[in-house]
Every structure is written in C-alpha cells, then in structure tokens.
C-alpha cells in the first residue's frame, strides 16, 4: 500500500504528478479519446471557477488510473453530491493508497494538498504495476557495494554505464535539422516519434516537445539543446552526471553527521519544549481550578443578585402603592383642613345672633310700650259694655 505524500504542498506534488501522467501516456490514452486538454500542474493546486467540474474531472482521471490497476468504479457526473464523489473515490482507493488521514471534505473541494497527494499515490501505484520503460537510476551514488569494487573517481574513462537501466527506444538526441531524431545507434529517423508513437513518455505532439525544450532551455540559462546535442551521443553527459553523483555521495557522510547533530539538537529542544509544556499545563490546571472556583462564586453571587433584584422589585411596588395612598390621604387632609378653616358659617351665625339681638330689643321695647299703654288705660265701669 502506498503512503500519500501529505507532508508536501500541492504545488510540489502536482509537478511530480504531471510527470508521472506523461510516463503513463495519459494524454494519448485518456485525454485525446475524451476530447480533453492535457493536464497541467495548476489543475490540481489552484481553484477553478467551477469547483464541482474540477472535482468531477479529477475523479474521472482517478477512475481511469484505477482502471489501469483493474479496479472498476462507477462513473460520476456534475449532478452527483461532492461528498458522495469523494467518499466513493476514497473507498475505491483504500486497497492501494493509505487514505486513513484523508477526510472526504478535503477532497470535495476539487483541488488542494490532500487531493493531489491521493492522485499522485494512485499514479505511483500504476507505475509500480505497469513498470514503463524509462531511464532510471539503479543505484544513484552507490559505491558498488554488490560488486565490492572500489573505482577510481579520477579515471574519466571508467565504465559506469552499468549503473543505469536505459531503454534504447528513449535514448536519442535532436539534430539541428527540425524533425530529425538520432537514436543511440546513430540512425537518423524522419520523425521525433518512436515506434510507440511517443516522443517522450506522455508526449505525442512535436509542438509539445518543442515547448518542453524551450522550458528546459530557459532553465539552463539560454543554452540551445538542439545545437549542443546535434549529432552527438548524450551518454557522455550521463557518465559525467554519474561521476558527479558519486562525488556527491561522498559528501553525504558529513551531511549525515550534520543532520545527526541537528537531530540531536532538535531532540534536546523538543525535550525542553516538552518540559516547558508540562510546566505550562500544570499552571493551566491550577488556573483552571481557580477559574472554576471563581465561576462558581460568580454563579452564586449572580443568583443572590437575581433574588435581591426580585425583592427590590417587590418592595418598589409596595412603595409605589404606599405613595399612592399617602397622596390620597394628603388630598383628603387638605380638603378637611380647608373645610376646618372655613369661617363663613360662623359669620352667618354671628350675623344671625346680631339680628336676633336687635329683634329681641325691639320686642322688649314693644312689650314695654304695651305694658305702659295697658297701665295707662282706666278700667271700665261695671255694667258698661264697651263696644
């Protein structure tokens, strides 16, 4: 089972994935029959304007790769649920790629680190099974441990081509004449394509090959590959690269020691960090306990405050009622005070008493006058009737 390169960013895995798709002749066997353009690295690490279409195209590519491994998967469409597409893809890949650390929601986006690592893992599985004929290193920088022979690095003529597995169909150089390809045997052919119909693994178009040459030419500082290798066998460069690789392999010892020292230093730093983390965790535990006590105290005070607020509300209501009653009593008291201070009735009584006193005096005078008149009148004679 292949472990996906989840630690690498998508932009790095995408470049490796495009190269592996070329080795699998993806453009010829998958893109052209389905009227699709060739895959570029940006298709895997950049978000497109339609994420669902991007997910569907990537899923279909994975299905084609799985079909190369003899695994049949149900097709997908733009109307399927993205989570369902991601889940089905992970289930189909679980026997060849370790998908334990790849969640479906990281696949449903249609791009990113996890999806690129998954597709790259499937491509690695295809290459491991199909084993295409490519130039590969059998023991890069090794010291011929199997042979037990120590070769002199200063001898430029030493035969070291046995460190390479070379497919003769892929060994060849371009001549200065456009459209001519020279094989290792020195035979010039009229076309850049080999018997398999490919210029290089995954390339069947001469225009694409020229674009590759221009890209490599710009990376090599403007050297024209066609002019340099015209009519020449580039195995000498492979030999030089092999010598350079062996020279570099000797430096790996010191590098390994430096790396070992760095690992030791990193280990010590990690131990310090772990100790500091434990100390901080203990402090966090103490402060967490204090925070819990403070929260409980705050909760109790909050409850008391709520009860006091209710009591204050009740007392405020009672106070309002008492104020209303006091206001009514004050109004009644003012009315009674006004009524008690009113002297109009007393004035009427006094006036009545004064008028009665005058009438009494008049009556007394009249009575006196009447008595006087009575006493002044002579009594009548007997037997005299006064009519």
From Swiss-Prot:
Keyword tags: Cell projection, Cilium, Cilium biogenesis/degradation, Cytoplasm, Cytoskeleton, Flagellum
InterPro entries reported for this sequence: Intra-flagellar_transport_57
Chief subcellular location: other
GO biological processes: cilium assembly; intraciliary transport; intraciliary transport involved in cilium assembly; non-motile cilium assembly
GO CC aspect terms: 9+2 motile cilium; axoneme; ciliary basal body; ciliary pocket collar; ciliary tip; cilium; Golgi apparatus; intraciliary transport particle B
Protein task: Component of the intraflagellar transport complex B (IFT-B) involved in flagellar assembly.
Designated name of the protein: Intraflagellar transport protein 57
Lineage, broadest ranks: Eukaryota, Metamonada, Diplomonadida, Hexamitidae, Giardiinae
